[in-house]
Amino acid sequence: MGSPEGRFHFAIDRGGTFTDVFAQCPGGHVRVLKLLSEDPANYADAPTEGIRRILEQEAGMLLPRDQPLDSSHIASIRMGTTVATNALLERKGERVALLVTRGFRDLLHIGTQARGDLFDLAVPMPEVLYEEVLEVDERVVLHRGEAGTGTPVKGRTGDLLEVQQPVDLGALRGKLEGLLSRGIRSLAVVLMHSYTWAQHEQQVGVLARELGFTHVSLSSEAMPMVRIVPRGHTACADAYLTPAIQRYVQGFCRGFQGQLKDVQVLFMRSDGGLAPMDTFSGSSAVLSGPAGGVVGYSATTYQQEGGQPVIGFDMGGTSTDVSRYAGEFEHVFEASTAGVTLQAPQLDINTVAAGGGSRLFFRSGLFVVGPESAGAHPGPACYRKGGPVTVTDANLVLGRLLPASFPCIFGPGENQPLSPEASRKALEAVATEVNSFLTNGPCPASPLSLEEVAMGFVRVANEAMCRPIRALTQARGHDPSAHVLACFGGAGGQHACAIARALGMDTVHIHRHSGLLSALGLALADVVHEAQEPCSLLYAPETFVQLDQRLSRLEEQCVDALQAQGFPRSQISTESFLHLRYQGTDCALMVSAHQHPATARSPRAGDFGAAFVERYMREFGFVIPERPVVVDDVRVRGTGRSGLRLEDAPKAQTGPPRVDKMTQCYFEGGYQETPVYLLAELGYGHKLHGPCLIIDSNSTILVEPGCQAEVTKTGDICISVGAEVPGTVGPQLDPIQLSIFSHRFMSIAEQMGRILQRTAISTNIKERLDFSCALFGPDGGLVSNAPHIPVHLGAMQETVQFQIQHLGADLHPGDVLLSNHPSAGGSHLPDLTVITPVFWPGQTRPVFYVASRGHHADIGGITPGSMPPHSTMLQQEGAVFLSFKLVQGGVFQEEAVTEALRAPGKVPNCSGTRNLHDNLSDLRAQVAANQKGIQLVGELIGQYGLDVVQAYMGHIQANAELAVRDMLRAFGTSRQARGLPLEVSSEDHMDDGSPIRLRVQISLSQGSAVFDFSGTGPEVFGNLNAPRAVTLSALIYCLRCLVGRDIPLNQGCLAPVRVVIPRGSILDPSPEAAVVGGNVLTSQRVVDVILGAFGACAASQGCMNNVTLGNAHMGYYETVAGGAGAGPSWHGRSGVHSHMTNTRITDPEILESRYPVILRRFELRRGSGGRGRFRGGDGVTRELLFREEALLSVLTERRAFRPYGLHGGEPGARGLNLLIRKNGRTVNLGGKTSVTVYPGDVFCLHTPGGGGYGDPEDPAPPPGSPPQALAFPEHGSVYEYRRAQEAV
């Protein structure tokens, strides 16, 4: 967009700590400025102050701070801001009330019902954003053609709907007036199915605005997409944040004469486009700051590197942002920020907990970086404010940061330089711990120098930052080594060469304004307007005309909006998108057809079908041509081209680069003389050989030995990364190498999982992510597994070790094994484990093993889904594999495995597998995942040698062992100091009366324990029997919870423990016993008993509340949340899954659209948590009304025995399963049953509450600080993928 000549253009990135200002001045030259975002003693607003200083510098005259600035010389102001993100993190937004369909008052509190941290017994979860809830009397449901339901209406998706209850506006008016009287002025309105039937929300909005509410966010307008939970969170975030943003914008404008009425003021949105300040809203603002950086490197590095794909690496103080650009922005349409899931287009920026301010720890022999951060206050130790030791301090100790290049803004008076002495002193304390462990630990070794310790922490931090980059690239079929690393942010330049080397990249590109690249990106960005609407059409020739009409209508909206902002049509471009998925799957992809022109068999807007198939194949490795493709949403993105064009390239060099000074930098092997160059003095063509430092006012760039930097014609730094000279690593324990191997081993398991998810075909594995992949040592001991599904933690190693003992020498190259038998380490039969032994030249036995365990939706048995509620013997639960060679001599044994999967059909009343095609496809995917693991470990062996890799497999297990021994010693010492015995015990009962007894004897001298389950009841005639492997998984889960911090989860966790389980008991049943209920129910009781013995917390709901619904046309399975137990310093969380399960629940709108049910209520069961000084969490109430005849099955516990309280706390309420027949008859179904239900019947599930902790009469604890979000705001598709994996 053209702008008047001779005026200023400002681009400002207002970050959490610093505000960066990039100004194009009259005449075209550039000024940049960095200042503190908060400095109330000197100025009220950092962006205004930045503009004032630059205007003052250019005008050569003082401009008083207390007077509005003359804006007549300003053409435009563009801003990215963390105002929205900070308000979310600190929970300092507007007071909001939520208006929601009756029966769903707690829907957003329950959310997906999954907890964020699997192993934190306190279940910390960010609180909801709203202050009050009003339930709205209204209801819309999807039409299913039942008799007597009235005339259906058509929604905007094309779906037919029934308005069962219009909005009762009369009743609502009085409630809204009550909110106004209590000072609430902002509303979020979230009604069922409003994405397609928005009329009810619109009626509520009109009423609310008439009554005087200043902000009303309708979910149908904030983001009209199916799924009420994320849409509701989005509407709440909009209502919570937009008033704060508007106040900030208004306050900013008041700092200028005329309040910027004649200045173009634009704000960066989360999707990478600019928006006028009057349309800038909360739900589109949470990535406003980091989005500018992505735009910056996409417009600079990508173009200058000839279109080579780029990884953006933005390392700041608290965290690092990682992203990818290959010619178009990569967006996600649902992501969590500060615990709030938003449905809105956002750049896929992955935020990880490793930054310059990340704290450094030495724990149980392991170097640990983050996730805790020093923050801006007190900051790293070198800030002179008593802060902890951090990555920044390590770099300062190594000489990679020069205090003289930083302003004197540190210390209590903010007038001192950085303090290397403070960094050394803080790091010496950690080095003392390191060397004490090295000299007195299990494997005595020579102590490390302070510099070696600092170098170790830097290397561990680098490896931590490489993991998300590998996930972002390899997970989508991209080779990370084929990318350029675009490095920016204040701390990134010190780590760029090492990161690139670790990922195999050849080139690092650092923009000359890398310390302010987010501000530069704002200057280069375009104005964007998007329009989107939901859809439910098939992508087929008969719908192409409708799709073209919808796209044309949305395109017209975008063009009109941009023209209204002053853009001529010639500067406006549009891009159309369809949100497509295969029918029957949940994996939708937002695809553009800009590279696929229209054909005779496509819409006029382009061949979206070809684009979808191409991307699906690239990301998942196959397509499903026999399945129809469904259109979920139609979207158009309009762009008004308005980015500035910068032409301030430096002059060509006229001589060799001038060395400003020489300094000492520490690298592998010791200190090296290192020249220091000033970026401002370098010219085009200058070449600098590493090692060297390049300094400017905003960043420090380290060019490592073996690398070469060259100044490009645009003044940027392009570093050619040379191959690293490998150091000598021996098999003896090195804590630095141990930390690096820990990351490498975990990365192998993670990448195996990505291959499995990409190549599997079933919903369970591809979309629900119900699988684990793992690496094992030569003895079958677990080394690493991902994700950490609790019930898989101890079981897979039992499976591998059984095969080693069972087959002995009958294992050969090219063999792949299949097993699921409970006696062979299986958890339940649908979990099929594929194991590949790995041979190495010169070795006669396998040198390690890889395995993948995946839940197959059906493997036969008496009921579809292979999880029968009434099985009494193992054969009724499906196909059984004790030790089966799935691949023999490199040949997949399809005929034999097919016969085995069909074998259950020979058992009376049973069927063979009902989905052989998916079984075979997923088994092949598991074999492929194992092959990836073999390749990656082979690369590791090639780098370090077999003896070293196997040694570190042992070292990482010993590290986990040490952490558990430390915990057991601390627990025993605490009891001894209080005069209590070193033996603890606990007992609980299953609902059938079967006791589970545990006695734990602690040895202080050994740091070990005996867990003795003697006295536990015998196996039962039913399916509550838990295989031994399930009990071991429950034990590892509990030990990890009791340790209370991140440790490697592997075989070493069980090394300090001897487990006694009576043969033939419910915890180690006979080989013929049915076990499906043991995996999902008994495992929870085992956890309650172990945690009860240690007094860690009261009992949680102790049940997964398994509900199955099916008939000839459909099948549905869910597990339902309950109350978590309270602990010594926390109230139990309400409405959440606990311990051995973390499954997400189906969104209510998806549930009603796919299955013949109406969800009438889903809310907390208030008062069901046990009373106590700390109260137990409440269970939930869930009511399903049936619209078709079906078979309902429930498999539940805690219907007889209540979840216990501790230390005087009262037990939680029992669960209750009620069936209310259409005629009004109410029946208690008991804990386990199957019953036929008919249209009009209602199933009412009341789940148990958690136990209370402490005497209810004790004084209540003093109120804490206001609820805040989680300590570290991880973000992006890599984080969402891990969250989804851990919600199984």
Swiss-Prot record:
Keywords, ordered alphabetically: ATP-binding, Cytoplasm, Hydrolase, Nucleotide-binding, Phosphoprotein
GO terms for MF: 5-oxoprolinase (ATP-hydrolyzing) activity; ATP binding; identical protein binding
Protein localization: Cytoplasm, Cytosol
Impact after mutating S323R: In OPLAHD; uncertain significance
TM region positions: none
Location of region: Disordered: 1248-1272
Matches recorded under InterPro entries: ACX-like_C (IPR049517), Hydant_A_N (IPR008040), Hydantoinase_A (IPR002821), Hydantoinase_B (IPR003692), Oxoprolinase-like (IPR045079)
A Gene Ontology cellular-component term: cytosol
Major subcellular location class: cytoplasm
Modification Phosphoserine, positions: S1265
Known catalytic reactions: 5-oxo-L-proline + ATP + 2 H2O = L-glutamate + ADP + phosphate + H(+)
Superkingdom of the source species: Eukaryota
GO biological process: one example: glutathione metabolic process
Subunit: Homodimer.
Function as written in the Swiss-Prot or TrEMBL entry: Catalyzes the cleavage of 5-oxo-L-proline to form L-glutamate coupled to the hydrolysis of ATP to ADP and inorganic phosphate.
Protein name: 5-oxoprolinase
Phylogenetic lineage: Eukaryota, Metazoa, Chordata, Craniata, Vertebrata
